[in-house]
Swiss-Prot record:
This is Polyadenylation factor subunit 2. Residues 533-545 have a biased composition (Low complexity). It comes from Cryptococcus neoformans var. neoformans serotype D (strain JEC21 / ATCC MYA-565). Required for 3'-end cleavage and polyadenylation of pre-mRNAs. Also involved in chromosome segregation where it has a role in chromosome attachment to the mitotic spindle. Residues 565-592 have a biased composition (Basic and acidic residues).
Length: 712
């Protein structure tokens, strides 16, 4: 069979084209490729954003997207309405946990009328800077509370979003500095005044509908009447003028001030006007007759601002003397003088819900909160010392009362909200377990009370009675927390692992009234005393008196003090600390042989503490270490069970009298051991404890009584 002929050129090279027509039906890949996947939408959006930034800026600089910060602009109204609609839970208030997600459980101030402190807006949220570098003279929330309107020294209105606080629009409305503007009570009109004395009308959409010359000089303040039919203005011409809004005509001019009138305010419900002037006078006017009803002469400087309280009973005035004066119109007397500012006070604002809460701003940039329900209403309850970098000119609360806005000379308007649940480092039991959360709280309180000299809060130490190796976490919130966990293992036979006492209940060497800075730490307490070995078994340090009595102190009238648990002893404070089970004297009971045993219980006192048998005195201080502090407790009454007798006490012998000698034959005594008189088990470093003769009542702080063989 003849092979097919391959077409070739004159040089013998094959011509293009398959020799076999069937070769066109076979596809042979030149290289292997992965199937194409569409790009992620997020990647496409980011690329589109970067392209738009490049086109707008003309360069290739990469800019980061910064999300807007939004607070609880609804003030918890939705949550509150839901709770009100549920039957039986209208008084229910959800708990706020330390988690940012719990912000949904915030309720509006109107739901918390009984607690004004929940409406203090001291948490900074956002700073809005004017587009034009000009001081912000006035800040006011719009009637719908969705936006904030500010006026500056260049005669411009600026709108800011009330939720994200970003800039929305700016409008030139005056030819001079805007000094005041206010919305009517029904929210349908806006009246503004400037430094040139011009008064203008605006719609809620900031459309100028009318303007006229109201004062010959600067107009400083504007206030509406309760029915929105009239408004009142004041100016540097020394006049207070009442205007008809519909006719835009002056109805009455109130003259009586001898200098510039800086502020004016109409009573919220009645026909009464208050004004303050540079002549240091506060005047009350009747708008129907134009007469001066009363004049207050308390101030000794210029009056910068005056405001009626929302209930209309009080009026607050402030000026260059840096104090705020409260007057009660029912008596026309000064009620209180609020101090706390260092410079002149420029603005005052009452809380719209809590009428006892007042906020003020001064020329130093400080914002102070005052509460008339406070035990000391003359001092601020909250101070924002650096709220602004320059003088604060205006303050305005959100109608719900959960956000405060402040305008300043530093060209900014700053927003403040209520304190929110903390985030970032959760200290709850769901993140750190219960012991971890308690440990974190303990470390926080330790650092607060001890500062940089705080010992480690998790230091393990020997405790009375062999408590095992499990770490005991102190209870947070009590006093003397650090002393409860400060522990250092002392002695060669330390076996205990528990804490030395509950916080505030028997902390070592902490006396009543001792400040945290004076509490002895393990590094400053010195080496143990003569009973170091017994001390290490029953507790690592001698327990001094604390701010609260210990459990042993409270129960020692009824029971012998129980030290730790050793091998076989119930009352011994350490290894073989007391008697055996057949000889322990727990609180002065009869022993099996019929003899009366006197422990630290109600069995009655012995005729006196023999040397080395335990007494009520403190042990001698070790050399080169500070002596034990004197006791702050009063001396115990005479003949009280469990306490030592008086120095000259002598009970006549007879039936029922305490024995004058040992009920058993004393064991043979060796050479005298030069032992110091031991202290009581709970108060001394000696190994002897209590008043039991054969192991009675070993102390929790030291070894208990006699050993099992009857010797010390």
């Amino acid at each position: 069979m003849t092979a097919p002929t391959v077409p070739a050129d004159q040089h013998g090279h094959p011509l293009p084209g398959p020799a076999d027509p069937a070769a066109n039906d076979t596809w042979r890949p030149s290289r292997y490729r992965e199937p194409l996947h569409p790009d992620n939408e997020e990647v496409l959006e980011q690329a589109a954003y970067q392209a738009a930034v490049t086109r707008s800026s003309g360069d290739d600089r990469k800019r980061k997207i910064k999300p807007r910060r939004t607070v609880d602009y609804q003030g918890g109204v939705q949550k509150w309405r839901m709770l009100n609609k549920l039957k039986g839970v209208h008084e229910f208030r959800p708990a706020i946990h330390p988690n940012p997600s719990d912000i949904v459980n915030f309720l509006p101030p109107v739901a918390l009328r009984s607690n004004p402190s929940t409406s203090i807006c001291d948490y900074w949220v956002h700073t809005s800077i004017n587009k034009e570098r000009s001081p912000t003279r006035v800040v006011r929330w719009t009637p719908d509370a969705r936006r904030l309107l500010t006026g500056n020294d260049k005669g411009q209105f600026t709108l800011w979003n009330g939720a994200s606080f970003n800039y929305e629009s700016i409008t030139q409305v005056h030819d001079d500095s805007i000094r005041s503007f206010t919305y009517s009570h029904n929210g349908q009109a806006l009246v503004s005044a400037d430094k040139g004395g011009t008064i203008k009308y605006f719609t809620p959409h900031l459309t100028n509908i009318h303007g006229f010359q109201g004062h010959r000089e600067a107009c400083h303040d504007v206030s509406w009447s309760p029915n929105d039919e009239r408004f009142v203005t004041c100016g540097d011409d020394g006049l207070v003028k009442i205007w008809s809004y519909r006719e835009a005509k002056e109805e009455r001019s109130l003259s009586g001030h001898g200098w510039d009138v800086r502020c004016v305010d109409w009573h919220p419900t009645k026909g009464l006007i208050v004004s303050g002037s540079k002549d240091m006078l506060v005047k009350f006017w009747d708008p129907r007759t134009g007469k001066d009803l009363s004049t207050l002469h308390s101030s000794k400087s210029t009056i910068n601002t005056c405001r009626w309280s929302p209930d209309g009973h009080l009026v607050a005035t402030a000026g260059q003397d840096s104090v705020i004066r409260l007057f009660d119109i029912r008596t026309f007397r000064e009620l209180e003088v609020l101090k706390g500012h260092e410079k002149e006070v420029n603005c005052i604002e009452w809380h719209p819900i809590h009428h006892s809460l007042l906020v003020s701003g001064d020329a130093l940039g400080t914002i102070n909160y005052f509460s008339l329900l406070s035990p000391t209403p003359s001092t601020p309850i909250t101070t924002l010392s650096a709220a602004h970098e320059d003088a604060v000119f205006s303050l305005s609360f959100h109608p719900l009362g959960h956000i405060l806005c402040s305008g300043s000379k530093d060209f900014t308007a700053r927003f403040w909200c209520r304190a929110r649940p903390p985030g970032g480092q959760e200290f709850d039991k769901w993140h750190l377990t219960e012991e971890g959360a308690a440990q974190k709280e303990l470390e926080r309180i330790t650092k607060r009370e001890w500062g940089t000299n705080a010992p480690p809060a998790n230091a393990a130490g020997g405790g009375g009675g062999g408590g095992g190796d499990k770490q005991q976490v102190a209870l947070p919130g009590l006093s003397n927390l650090v002393a409860a966990v400060n522990s250092v293992k002392t002695g060669p036979t330390t076996t205990g692992g528990g804490p030395s006492g509950l916080p505030g209940l028997g902390a070592p060497n902490v006396h009543a009234g001792t400040p945290p800075s004076r509490v002895s730490t393990p590094s400053s307490m010195g080496p143990p005393g003569p009973g170091a070995q017994g001390q290490a078994q029953g507790g690592q340090f001698p327990r001094g008196r604390s701010a609260l009595p210990s459990q042993n102190d409270m129960l020692r009238h009824n029971h012998g003090s129980r030290g730790g648990f050793a091998d076989r002893d119930r009352n011994g404070g350490g290894d073989r600390g007391g008697m055996d089970r057949d000889r322990d004297s727990r609180g002065g009971r009869q022993d099996p042989r019929g003899n009366q045993m006197y422990g630290r219980g109600p069995g009655g006192p012995p005729p006196g503490p023999p040397p080395g048998q335990g007494g009520y005195n403190y042990p001698p201080a070790p050399p080169n270490y500070p002596p034990y502090p004197p006791s702050s407790y009063p001396p115990p009454p005479n003949n009280q069970p469990g306490y030592p007798p008086a120095p000259n006490y002598a009970m006549p012998p007879g039936p029922g009298a305490p024995p004058q000698s040992y009920p058993y034959n004393r064991p043979p005594q060796g050479p005298p051991q030069n032992n110091n008189p031991g202290g009581q088990g709970n108060y001394g470093a000696s190994a002897s404890g209590g008043y039991g003769q054969y192991g009675g009542g070993g102390g929790g702080g030291g070894g208990g009584g006699y050993g099992r063989d009857g010797r010390r």
